[in-house]
Structure formats: C-alpha cells, structure tokens
C-alpha cells in the first residue's frame, strides 16, 4: 500500500508525524502546517482554567465560530510529548515533503514553514504571496471555481505528487 497525504494547519503537523511513523506513507504535503504543538497551549491561569472546565474555546477569525479545544488533547500531548514533537519527526523524515505557506497567514506564520523546510531533508518550500491561512477559501464556499491562491496550492500539490509519487507507482 502506498499513500500520499495532505495536512492543513494543525493537521499539517499531525500528518508529518504520521508520515514519519508509517512506512506506507510515501509523500506528504503540508498546507500552512504548524511546526510545534507545545507552544500553542496556554500556561498559568489559563491552563488551570482549561483543566478545571475541561474545554476552552477560541474564536475562528474567519468564521467567528467558537471552536472547542478539549483538555484531553493537552493531556494526550503531554503523555506522548516525545512522539508528538514535530521537529524530531521532521528531522528524521526521509520522504518527499512539499510545504505550502501563504505570506499573509493570520494563524500560522511563514516562519514555521521555513523551520519545517530546514528540518525536512527532502522538502520543497512553496510560498504563495498574499495567501491567507485558508488560501482564500471560506465556508460555505458558494463559487464555481476555487479561489486563486487555493487553485495555486492545488496545482503545486498535483505537480509534486506527479513528480514524487505517481511516476514511481504507475
């Protein structure tokens, strides 16, 4: 079985870890992927409040939804912190990785993409000038065509898959 995966935002970090752990995964694309889970957690009183309530909410800046974050996620991370250290997995990953990042991402700064690129031995970095965290997409998407930045990211992903995945297996 040969698998190619794509991960966005926190899912970019998760998919990088999974690509490191799972030999079936042959190639990875991260879109606005995070480089570190630990520094995204609150500390001090905010951490204690989260623990006591079991959930905290953060507002999605695009949709204004209140997004739940359950304390169990933090506990799981702490119990498995070594496993969930993106930097370690990235530095030991021997698979092709495409890192796509927008320069106007309000949630994941482009510095994280540069770190991922530095850590991943077999990576390509693709920066999209002016692209935000969702590459111009929003929910609900009512248009016929993808936004230009997302279409650009999709085209680059297809190019990368053709070069690093499809030609090897078909």
What are these regions (language model features)?
Residues 43-61:
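A catalytic-pocket lid/entrance helix-loop region that shapes and gates access to the active site
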Residues 131, 135, 139-170:
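Catalytic active-site module of serine/aspartate enzymes centered on a nucleophile-bearing elbow/loop
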Residues 92-94, 99-101, 105:
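Short beta-strand/loop motif that positions the catalytic acidic residue
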């Amino acid at each position: 079985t040969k698998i190619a995966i794509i991960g966005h935002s926190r899912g970019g970090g998760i998919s990088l870890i999974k690509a490191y752990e799972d030999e079936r995964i042959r190639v990875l694309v991260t879109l606005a992927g995070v480089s570190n889970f630990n520094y995204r957690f609150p500390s001090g009183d905010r951490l204690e409040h989260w623990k006591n309530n079991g959930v905290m909410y953060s507002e999605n800046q695009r949709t204004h939804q209140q997004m739940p974050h359950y304390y169990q996620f933090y506990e799981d991370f702490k119990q498995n912190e070594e496993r969930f250290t993106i930097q370690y997995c990235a530095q030991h990953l021997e698979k092709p990785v495409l890192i796509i990042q927008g320069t106007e991402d309000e949630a994941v700064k482009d510095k994280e993409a540069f770190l991922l690129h530095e850590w991943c031995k077999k990576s390509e970095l693709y920066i999209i000038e002016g692209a935000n965290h969702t590459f111009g997409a929003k929910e609900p998407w009512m248009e016929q065509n993808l936004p230009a930045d997302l279409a650009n990211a999709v085209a680059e992903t297809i190019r990368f898959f053709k070069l690093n995945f499809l030609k090897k297996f078909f």
